[in-house]
A protein has these predicted regions:
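Extended C-terminal regions of large enzymes
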Residues: 53, 74-76, 151-186, 192-700
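N-terminal amphipathic, basic-rich helices that act as targeting or association modules
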Residues: 1-64, 70-72, 163-165, 182
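Glycine-rich phosphate/pyrophosphate-binding loops
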Residues: 96-128, 194-208, 379-387
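Structured core elements
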Residues: 8-13, 20, 59, 102, ...
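Feature captures the catalytic cores and cofactor-binding loops of soluble hydro-lyases/lyases
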Residues: 39-122, 130-133, 137-147
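Short, glycine-/Ser/Thr-/acidic-enriched flexible segments
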Residues: 14-17, 25-26, 63-67, 83, ...
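Extended catalytic cores of very large enzyme megasubunits
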Residues: 4, 19-20, 24, 65-72, ...
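A generic structural signal for short, non-catalytic loop/turn and secondary-structure boundary residues
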Residues: 2-5, 14, 51-55, 71, ...
Length: 700
């Protein structure tokens, strides 16, 4: 596989120390990334394996577009068994930054980590030179000190994915960090820690072969000038502007006159009006610190940054000298939940320092720098919501030993004092006391602390599944569409295909026109909190959303920006280009490709995930044992009937019908929700069908 793929799998057995090379072309029908990860895990990690068992594996997988220069393509899919949900089923972490590109430049599509080292090690990769190095001197350090030490030993160009103390201590809600703030979560930090693997350091010099460089350049120019919007591909500005027909205050296209990177080197830089067409100014459109934290963040913002080969720059970079008072660096940044979640635990809000709302900005940078250095992971904010629930409902007072409860500075919590966050995160990362079990995950604390139905049914806690994972653009995002999407994976679904479309900022009439073109009817698309009963078009919308995220996690592309469903260009009538993934695929690999073929590959990957989940759970009845939804989704807003303006609560009968229709659309058993022999055969998964049949896991 000379173009796009490298053709190489690097297998590292930590138990034996053996490092071997395999051919990745045997998995080509699964494209890459998520597809490679699921196939390797299905073949090699049997039911009954626990996440910290030596037999569990950690699969880092890229795709043919990774590192190619295609916009937003530096993603690595990390597949393993869940540390934090019921049943320890297969999950993925999705890590940006520079690690994925360096993997490809070094010559690897996949890195398989297996076994367990006798003592701490780190994996050193420089092109074809691969070795396991002693890491005793790194054990106990945070992700940043670890990265700095390894870069001193290797090169400033080395990209290091490291765990902190949380991963070392097998904290279920832990992850790994590369390039300072780019995380891979889902418990993968604890998996690395269980294997005594402190870090993977990669430096590559080979590049990625492109079949048609001229076409690649043309596609890049086309996407950058005609199609791409801002973060989450929002395609209208957040304020009325001279060039824009529409605006939406919720849009992440936040650039405007009078809004500055206030702490930029050399003096403030105005973001200004950024009409489409100029590739060099795309990076000004998204201003996440102000979007996430409010106007008080402006004076501390140095710039926006981001992943390799991404023009959007959704990662805030701030410099707040006062933060040093709390023992952390004054610089740092992130995006989305990681930017703002830390001060949400304060019942009365964070305490301000000098300016209005600066407590939120300062407190979150302190929290962010601690959280990332320890290698903790928030489970899409669920860790902090669980804290709030347990504090407000008196759970901590009930379950913590009296001595431990007395030594915690609850007065700091009430006062919004950032020092509480310091103590809280230290306890979590170092497994100090009963409180630290909060980072075991929602399912574990519900069992351990006997939280009962009140916990699962509490709407503000936002737990979607009784398996212990939260909503991620669920019923509030196109009702049944988001609800189906949130049922399908074994963690929060990490799917932005539908929410990017919903949040684009275009008016409802235009959105419904696009929905009709894509899904056959305007009825696919409802106004938020004014939704209608399920219909066939909504099912097609849900399937499209899921297949696109699987495709993006396979090729790999960032699903926070892709697909190009709509455009900022009035001259295109705001239409995007949903065949762009196939066009890039062809230009990079040289293989003839249509979007229909890629969609079929995505369906193969998605169905393999379903089949592996069936196998791990040892049940065919996915409807009643897996695709479960917490009661608050149906019981919220008791004064407003379903299908009435003002609510996004779901109807139980309608949701049952929605799942039945979706199962049929996928070719799964309409009652059980598991793949059929016919569908597995249609998708080229005959070996999976035979294996499931041998275990009596196919429907009659």
């Amino acid at each position: 596989m000379a173009n796009g793929w490298t053709g190489n799998i690097l297998r590292v057995n930590l138990t034996t120390g053996n490092i071997t090379l395999e051919d990745s072309s045997k998995f080509k029908s699964f494209v890459g990334g998520m597809g490679f990860g699921y196939k390797i895990m299905y073949d090699e990690v049997p039911p009954g394996t626990k996440p910290f068992d030596e037999a569990n594996k950690l699969v880092f997988a890229t795709g043919p577009l990774t590192g190619s220069g295609a916009p937003c393509s530096s993603r690595v899919n990390i597949t393993s068994l869940s540390t934090f949900t019921k049943g320890n089923l297969v999950v993925d972490a999705h890590m940006g930054g520079f690690f994925a590109a360096q993997m490809k430049f070094a010559g690897y599509d996949v890195i398989i980590i297996e076994g367990k080292a006798k003592s701490p090690v780190w994996l050193k990769i420089k092109d074809d030179k691969v070795s396991l190095e002693k890491a005793d001197f790194l054990w106990g350090k945070g992700t940043r000190a670890t990265t700095e030490e390894i870069c001193r030993l290797t090169s400033p160009e080395t990209c290091v994915a490291a765990i902190g103390q949380a991963g070392e201590n097998l904290v279920p809600l832990s992850g790994m960090l590369n390039s300072r703030n780019h995380s891979g979560g889902a418990g993968t930090g604890a998996i690395m820690g269980s294997k005594n693997l402190k870090a993977i350091a990669v430096e590559g010099t080979k590049g990625v072969n492109i079949a048609d460089r001229q076409e690649m350049k043309r596609l890049n120019d086309y996407m950058m000038t005609e199609l791409i919007g801002a973060n989450n591909n929002h395609v209208v500005p957040s304020t009325p502007q001279s060039w824009a027909e529409y605006s939406d205050p919720k849009s992440r296209w936040t650039a405007r006159k009078g809004l500055f990177w206030g702490a930029a080197e050399g003096g403030p830089i105005e973001t200004g009006e950024i009409p489409p067409g100029n590739q060099n100014t795309v990076g000004f459109r998204t201003y996440k610190s102000v979007f996430d934290l409010g106007p008080a963040a402006e004076k501390y913002t140095v710039k926006m940054s981001g992943c390799h080969s991404c023009p959007i720059r959704c990662m805030t970079q701030m410099n707040i000298p006062r933060v040093k008072e709390f023992g952390v660096p004054s610089t740092g940044g992130n995006t989305c939940v990681a930017n703002f979640v830390h001060t949400t635990i304060f019942p009365n809000g964070p305490k301000d320092f000098e300016d209005k709302d600066d407590g939120r900005v300062i407190g979150n940078l302190v929290g962010l720098n601690l959280f990332d250095d320890y290698g903790l992971w928030c489970n899409y904010g669920q860790l902090h919501r669980d804290f709030t629930y347990c504090y407000s409902k008196g759970v901590f007072k009930r379950v913590l030993p009296a001595e431990e409860y007395a030594e915690i500075h609850w007065d700091q919590l009430e006062a919004g004092d950032v020092n509480f966050i310091k103590d809280f995160y230290y306890r979590l990362a170092h497994r100090v006391g009963e409180l630290s079990h909060l980072a075991d995950g929602s399912y574990a604390i519900a069992e351990r602390w006997n939280l009962g139905e009140e916990y699962w049914g509490y709407a503000k806690n936002k737990l979607w599944s009784p398996f212990g994972y939260p909503v991620h653009h669920a019923n509030e995002a196109s009702a049944q569409v988001g609800s189906i999407v949130n049922c399908m994976f074994n963690r929060d679904c990490m799917t932005h295909t539908h929410i990017n479309f919903i949040g684009s900022g275009l008016p409802l009439k235009l959105q419904r026109e696009v929905a009709k073109e894509l899904f056959g009817s305007e009825d696919a698309y409802d106004e938020t909190k004014n939704y209608t009963p399920i219909n066939d078009a909504k099912i097609k919308y849900a399937k499209w959303s899921l297949l696109r995220v699987c495709l993006h996690n396979a090729v790999t592309l960032c699903n926070w920006v892709w697909p190009m469903t709509v455009s900022p260009r009035k001259s295109r009538n705001y239409r995007g280009d949903l065949a762009l993934e196939a066009k890039f695929f062809k230009a990079i690999t040289g293989e003839e490709m249509t979007q229909e073929k890629l969609d079929l590959a995505a369906e193969r990957i998605f169905t393999l995930h379903r089949a592996y989940t069936v196998k791990l759970m040892q049940t065919k009845d996915m409807r009643n044992e897996h695709d479960l939804i917490c009661s608050w989704v149906f019981d919220k807003d008791p004064q407003i009937p379903v299908f009435t303006e003002g609510t996004d609560k779901m109807d139980r009968d309608d949701m049952h019908a929605s799942l039945t229709m979706f199962y049929k659309e996928m070719g799964w058993d309409p009652q059980l929700g598991c793949p059929t022999h016919e569908t597995l055969q249609r998708l080229g998964l005959e070996d999976i069908a035979a294996d499931l049949a041998a275990h009596n896991l196919l429907p009659a």
